[in-house]
Amino acid sequence: MKHPKILSILLLALLISAGISWDQFTHPDISSEGAVSLPEKEIHIPATAETPPAPALQAKYACVMDSISGRTLYGKDMDMKAPMASTTKIMTAILVLESGRIEETVCASSYAASMPKVHLGMQKGYQYHLKDLLYSLMLESHNDSAVAIAEHMSGSVQEFAEQMNQKAAELGMANTHFVTPNGLDAEDHYSTASDMCRLAAYAIQNREFCALIQAKSHHFSTIDGKHNYSVSNKDAFLSYYEGALGIKTGFTGKAGYCFVGAARRNDTTLTSCVLACGWPPNKSYKWTDTKKLMDYGFTNYAPLVMPVQDLTALRIPVEDGKSSFVSCQQPDEIHTISSRSEAITVIYEIPEKLYAPVHADTPVGNISFYINDTLYCKENIFPSESIEKSVFSDTIRNVLHLWMENFG
């Protein structure tokens, strides 16, 4: 124990000569001098308007959603499962477009040719360009084209439906299940108004999809040139509503009239869905309801960037670190949409000090964003750099430990 004693005595002499007290090491702490904290740990922006009245709708199920943030602006039984008729074909089209196979040749089967109206009128053995069948599918909602596409893409309708369901799961469509590629009434074929809004928001990110649904007409023929076809866009929403991007209508005896729509004005893009929106002769209900939903969204909501203080100006004390302070990375902007009737609250959770080692990829705190007291999202706060633990500090503690063992 001779050498440890000598080291301890030398250390003690060094500390005394440097004017450093024993208590600074037996009860380690760092000075808060030089630390910079946030001006406010909580920011509250009050509402400045009354809650807008809900739109009066004919549809049993409805939803309008901000396509960028995915925030629901209004819903009417929007998570109730219901048949969605030919709005199903949105998913069918997206799977084809994302496959990169639109130049392939499709041969119609007898099963595809047997599909009821609305249909293209294909016969067994007819061959088409896959791209042409997409126009048939989305402009005039042909059921035979949907089946021919599904069989070509996956070998069977059943296998294609599995791909549809896999994609739905990826998109967070938790209350959706596909059985057919065309939306004809089938057991266990259903979705919800909110899920279909999510699908529409995803679909309109695809430029080819947008070009497809906005085409006024398309002319094509079978591969051999013997049979010619002309299809025109049946989506009246395109001319009915300012800023309309269109998307897809639907009707079956079980589903009633349905429509999934999208519209853009300035920096806001909304998607909407109405299901079970009347039965014959009330064909126009889907248009008036969709207009009400879109008007509700565009009139009462506007884009918002959540307020965040400058975290790069922070100086958080670091205990036992090679650096005494660390700042924080500025998080990415949080974009959403909000109404003047909604209060915004931002709460910061940041420690008063940190203990080395500090890792730049490990969060040291978080920011919670609330809309009307409901948590909207939570973002992690990361340090601006990694801070290693001080080796000198460890050495001193080891020597002090020996001192305590021998003289304490």
List PLM regions with ranges:
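An N-terminal domain-start capping segment
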Residues: 16-18, 26, 89, 399-400
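Domain-terminus/edge residues, biased toward the C-terminal soluble/receptor-binding domains
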Residues: 2, 22, 174, 187-190, ...
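Basic side chains
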Residues: 2-5, 76, 89, 167, ...
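Sec-dependent N-terminal signal peptides of Gram-positive bacterial secreted proteins and lipoproteins
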Residues: 3-24
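Active-site-adjacent loops and short helices of periplasmic peptidoglycan-processing enzymes
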Residues: 23-207, 223-224
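N-terminal hydrophobic or amphipathic segments with adjacent small-residue motifs
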Residues: 13, 64, 115, 119, ...
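Generic detector of short alpha-helix boundary/capping microenvironments
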Residues: 6-9, 50, 57-58, 80-81, ...
